[in-house]
Amino acid sequence: MANLVVLPGAARRPAGDLVMGDVARESADEIIEALQELDVDHDGSISLDDTDVTVSDAADEAERRAPGHGDDAVIWEELDERTIEDTRLTWAFVVFLALATQLAGIAALTDSPILVVGAMVLGPEFGAIAAICFGVVFRDVRRIGRALGTLTVGFAVAIAVTYVCALVSRWIGVIELHQLPASRPLTQFIYTPDRWSFVVALLAGAAGVLSLTAGKSSALVGVFISVTTVPAAGNLAVAMALRHWSEIDGSVLQLLVNLAGMLLAGTLTLLVQRGVWHIARKRQTAVRARTT
């Protein structure tokens, strides 16, 4: 820790002191645990705020003494809070997923890869997937159940809305039964899963979890446009509305394969990070013990 500031009696509710300081990301989790052992989170509160730039020799020294590297560090409390938020079934989640699924349905009708990418980016489902991975690693059954419920209800509503819209469009003559072409060279992958579907889902799941733990949200865009969850859901809805029964099984399988791959890879990634960081902290503790 560096640049420690103590303001005695500054807090009013609850009454107490205000303590601030710069902490290397690598040491944040250890310090949070120490504060929790003192019941600071119950008697007061612990707040974290990222600092983009700090020009300070003391801060540089604190970072040098911290174990590992900042980009590799995982602040488990931060991830805990974030994944709790992502388990909640909100109107925003359902609306975004429904809009993304409708875009995917239009992409299937027009054989448009651009719309497929748009639907992938708009889909909000990865947050709930990450919450399930976190729940598995920390054996939080309640979190897993809530996240699974959010995913299930969200996709069910999104598919139902897209299905109804496709039916109405068919009834008013906007689209016809033959509108969904049998040959779609640009978007056929939506309903034809293969071994690469699972491989891509594994890679995307690992990358997605790493982007969350490292605080690199920009990498999530690459995750969104790699997996075929939302496009498969959109194609499923349109195929049912236009009676293209041969594509239904493939769409369902593609959706499940992508979800399973991301869940597996995300969980394994968190397990590895937890183990590696535990070893790094033990080594740092041993070094401190020898130098004191």
Segments the model singles out, each with a brief description of its role:
Residues 152-292:
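Generic detector of multi-pass transmembrane helix bundles and their immediately adjacent loops
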Residues 1-73:
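Soluble N-terminal domains of membrane-associated systems
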Residues 57-101, 107:
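Cytosolic-side membrane-insertion boundary helix
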Residues 85-168:
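Core alpha-helical transmembrane segments of integral membrane proteins
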